Amino acid sequence: MQDNEPKNSEGLTREDTPLAAQQCGKGINSITEYLFVNLPFDSKPSDEMIATLPDAEKNAIAKMAHFFLQARYEESAAEAKRCMNSQHPEVNTFALLAHILNHVALNNMEVVQKDFQDLRQRTQHPENKHVAALNDIFRFALSVFFHLGEATAPISPESFSHCSEGSRLYALYAQSYALYLQQEYAQALGMAEAALMMDANRHEVICIYLNVLASMAAMSLSYFDRADRFFLNALRIAKPMGYIQPFIGHHGPLQGLVEKHIRDREPELYKMISDKVMLFRHGWTEVHNPQSQDKVTNLLTPYEFALAMMAAKGKSNQEIADYLNISINTVKAYLSIVYQKVGITKRSELKNYLVK
């Protein structure tokens, strides 16, 4: 079949064109702007630094992020591999982070372990304060994402002063996530909302993640209407570009939001997300479980996991049924299957086999 879709100057179809390249007035540099700081005391501001990057490298950075957000892990990993050879530590460390996450999804754990060792070495020997700040954020974000944050030092205040606006907002997302893991749901929600107000829709990718985080916290507080609103905001931004990864990586803590808003309305999209959830969760647990007392199960389907998360977070069978528009008997049947699969008899034991 002939592809009649118009292509841009670099030979990419719209499907392959990163979000950065399609934002009017921003161009492909909008992804790299997250990595290079632009503050009054900088001797070399962001625009000048970015101008030194070859076009091919800027495009590779944007494609790496774009493919990952679309859950196209092999393609993203290939672009990350290219970017890991960059002479700029801001770029090659960011690429290493992406390389780790892609290979978690691909279940290539030997690659993941090697990359983690490399990242630890880099964080111990940063080239300058800006690179040290980015390393600090990446270190913290990875620990939070894999739910290993109990013994992790927080992001230092100094790191915020040496980062771009986009990186600072990403750091606020990570800190909000950490508060969520500490069950400080009201604080997590407040921080995410404040960051969204600061963002003012300037950074769409980060805005997706902040809305997802806010919806997680709101669900944990049983603020169902607010959770719906934040989730639908994230979906509204993400869907036109096929950015499903935020909903894959946060599926468990979203506690049924994916099921409520996507499962019946868009079954093909839900199947795509569910298939990737199973793949990604397997790799995620390979990182998380050996380093945590909580052993997250891989035995549940995404739908079973979502219902189990709602039950573990204190939702009654009636609340689950009302929220997902199913019968109480259906809820009971699914929870019975969950108990059987993980080998428990009490609702209170669920938390030992699920994400936080």
Give the label of every model feature segment:
Residues 1-87, 91-93, 109, 244, ...:
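Flexible inter-repeat linkers and adjacent short helices
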Residues 29-47, 65-81, 104-118, 143-156, ...:
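Helix-turn-helix repeat elements of alpha-solenoid scaffolds
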Residues 47-56, 81-92, 117-130, 155-168, ...:
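Solenoid-like repeat scaffolds
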Residues 80, 98, 192, 308-311:
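Small side chains
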Residues 287-336, 340-345, 351-356:
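Helix-turn-helix DNA-binding segment
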